[in-house]
Design a protein with these regions (language model features):
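Short, Lys/Arg-enriched N-terminal segments with co-localized hydrophobic residues
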Residues: 1-9
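N-terminal glycine-rich phosphate-binding loop and ensuing alpha1 helix
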Residues: 12-63
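Short, high-confidence coil segments that cap the C-terminus of an alpha-helix
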Residues: 56, 102, 130-132
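Short phosphate-binding loop-to-helix
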Residues: 60, 66-125
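Conserved core of the sugar-phosphate nucleotidyltransferase
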Residues: 115-198
């Protein structure tokens, strides 16, 4: 049982864990979890904001790197877990989900130091209130987004995500920009690691 806070943090009698996937290797920014922002490492900035959220009874950093675990282990109110190597953050969270006893999991990216706790709380409440299998927020596309490889774009149809991309492979009136938060029922993300990868990988 990884619960480290209390039932006080439950929402509508549902237990919610926050899993923060982080790794040192990155195509675009090597070692970014340890990059300092005003003197404090990025991954710790993410943790700071996760602790401000109202509904997380467990906060876990999931990483394949011992240096990240060693840093996080010095912090209070969270734990760290060493995972295997994974292609995506969702696969890393899926591995951890198998050992969690909770109703929902929020995937908060380890490179989101400006994550807004109020936005996160809203997503959690929306997902629980609507009994959603998964919630993936997005924003409208702005000028320059389609050419920026750091911006993940999504094609949506009737509220369902069809396709994610970093290059303008498909640009339609239904193209929007992904916001890097994922909220899902535990059993949904737990099964994710068992799914076959398709030829479409962003």
């Amino acid at each position: 049982d990884y619960t480290i806070r209390s039932e006080f943090f439950m929402y509508r009698n549902k237990t919610i864990a926050c899993v923060i996937p982080a790794r040192m290797s990155s195509f675009r920014f090597q070692n970014k979890p340890l990059a300092k922002i005003c003197g404090r490492e990025m991954i710790l900035r993410v943790l700071d904001n996760a602790k401000k959220c109202k509904h997380f009874d467990t906060i876990i950093v999931a990483t394949e790197d011992q240096v990240i675990k060693d840093l996080v282990d010095k912090e209070e109110g969270c734990i760290s877990i060493i995972t295997g190597k994974h292609y995506t953050c969702n696969h890393r969270v899926s591995e951890v989900a198998s050992d969690l006893k909770c109703d929902y999991i929020f995937n908060l990216q380890g490179d989101e130091p400006l994550a807004n706790p109020e936005h996160i709380d809203y997503i959690v409440e929306y997902g629980v209130d609507h009994e959603s299998d998964m919630v993936q927020p997005y924003r409208e596309t702005l000028e320059g987004d389609t050419e920026d490889p750091d911006v993940v774009q999504m094609v949506v149809n009737n509220g369902r995500v069809l396709y994610l991309m970093r290059t303008p492979d498909i640009v339609t009136e239904n193209t929007v920009v992904q916001i890097g938060y994922y909220f899902y029922k535990r059993e949904v993300i737990e099964d994710y690691k068992n799914l076959d990868m398709t030829y479409v990988k962003y």
